[in-house]
């Protein structure tokens, strides 16, 4: 019985070990995003609609996988938020905005460190250097929220993955910063910031190829672990089968011996009588 339990526990631990890469494919920087992101809506409401925020926008957010632009975009967001923080006083009426921006700066700085730790050093990038542009609070924080969403699925990129963007793409043509697009902030509840987006939003944000690779990375370890689990189960069953057969035979022999002994005992008692 103890041997059976040992084999079962071994198979369970093996399954968990093989599923470990599957868990790591889900946003490795995701835990850096705190509930303070929900204050973005309040901050946008507090800022004048015609207030302009400077941001060095990284082109290609619509046409490239997130790992291509997120490392640069998050740095530029950090710089812009830091500049914005310096413009607000940390006393009196500016305290609310100052506190919100300060928390957002801390989040973005943590994401910068996470990207540096997990980005591929051999990744080739061919897009132009970001150029400073002016954005309204709605436009700026739309880019901010989309960058935050990208971290939900951020994984380590393949070393052979190239990030090439067409030379004809300009910030003005990028629909992500189109000034005519209505401002739609994502839900600000903490659960929605940590849960997956809807399938339609995922398709809009990620190219089909990137999504296919993501699902392949999830499916292959799962399939491999199932095959290994069945193989160990078959080997264990094959090993245990002869011993089980012998055990059944021994039980039958013992029962027959007991019956014979009982009959002999009764026969002796009858003869004595």
Curated annotation (Swiss-Prot):
It is linked to Hyperpigmentation with or without hypopigmentation, familial progressive: A disorder characterized by hyperpigmented patches in the skin, present in early infancy and increasing in size and number with age. Hyperpigmentation has variable intensity, and sometimes is associated with cafe-au-lait macules and larger hypopigmented ash-leaf macules. Deafness, congenital, unilateral or asymmetric: An autosomal dominant form of non-syndromic, sensorineural deafness characterized by inability to hear affecting one ear. Some patients suffers from asymmetric, bilateral hearing loss. This is Kit ligand. GO terms for cellular component: cytoplasm; cytoskeleton; extracellular region; extracellular space; filopodium; lamellipodium; plasma membrane. Glycans are attached at residues 90, 118, 145, 167-168, 180, 195. Gene3D superfamilies: 1.20.1250.10. The record marks 97 as: Not glycosylated. It comes from Homo sapiens (Human). GO terms for biological process: cell adhesion; ectopic germ cell programmed cell death; embryonic hemopoiesis; extrinsic apoptotic signaling pathway in absence of ligand; hematopoietic progenitor cell differentiation; male gonad development; mast cell apoptotic process; mast cell migration. Belongs to the SCF family. The chain crosses the membrane at residues 215-237. Homodimer, non-covalently linked. Heterotetramer with KIT, binding two KIT molecules; thereby mediates KIT dimerization and subsequent activation by autophosphorylation. Coiled coil: none annotated. Pfam families: SCF. Residues 238-273 are cytoplasmic. Residues 1-25 form the signal peptide. InterPro entries: 4_helix_cytokine-like_core, SCF. Keywords: Cell adhesion, Cell membrane, Cell projection, Cytoplasm, Cytoskeleton, Deafness, Disease variant, Disulfide bond, Glycoprotein, Growth factor, Membrane, Non-syndromic deafness, Secreted, Signal, Transmembrane, Transmembrane helix, Waardenburg syndrome. Disulfide bonds join 29-114, 68-163.
